[in-house]
Amino acid sequence: MKAEVAHFTTEQMVDMVGLLSPCMDDYLYVCDFKEDYYQISPNAVKRFCLPADHFHNVVEMHRQVVYPDDLDLLLVELELLSTGRKVFHNLHYRWLDKMGMPVWINCRGIVIDDSQGKPQYLVGCLNETGNQRRADNITGLLGGIEFNTYMRSHK
């Protein structure tokens, strides 16, 4: 798989995260390797040990949110992605919630190269893999919270 080529500025990509985030339960992110900058959906700050929805010093800031036993795994992955030795990110590991408890996530993304073919961005989506299902696909019944929401919306 070959990396895509950037046709957007960092600002445009960050704006896209802000635009699409309210439409999703998952968390979109943009990591700019050259600027050492990271932007994630604003609602991620409410859930995880993140100081803000955007920051510089990507590795140092991830030390605050990644479960310590999983940090080396992520650091190796980021090195491979930022040097072009890997172009697709798909990693299961743990982040810390606001209470400091580990939360299993799946983080996927794709590397986007600059015009010289060097990795510039990693863009993708982070989702919680431990979330309870909202509905049972066998019975078709909604789960508790979803059922209550559905009933309130149909009064």
Language-model features: where?
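PAS-family sensory domain signal
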Residues: 2, 8-63
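Sensory coupling linkers of modular signal transduction proteins
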Residues: 3, 116-146
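Signal-transducing coiled-coil linker helix
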Residues: 12-14, 20, 139-143, 150
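Active-site-proximal structural segments of metal-dependent nucleotidyl cyclase/transferase enzymes
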Residues: 26, 147-155
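Hydrophobic pocket-lining residues within nucleotide cofactor-binding pockets
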Residues: 33, 112, 129
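PAS-family sensory domains
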Residues: 50-122, 151
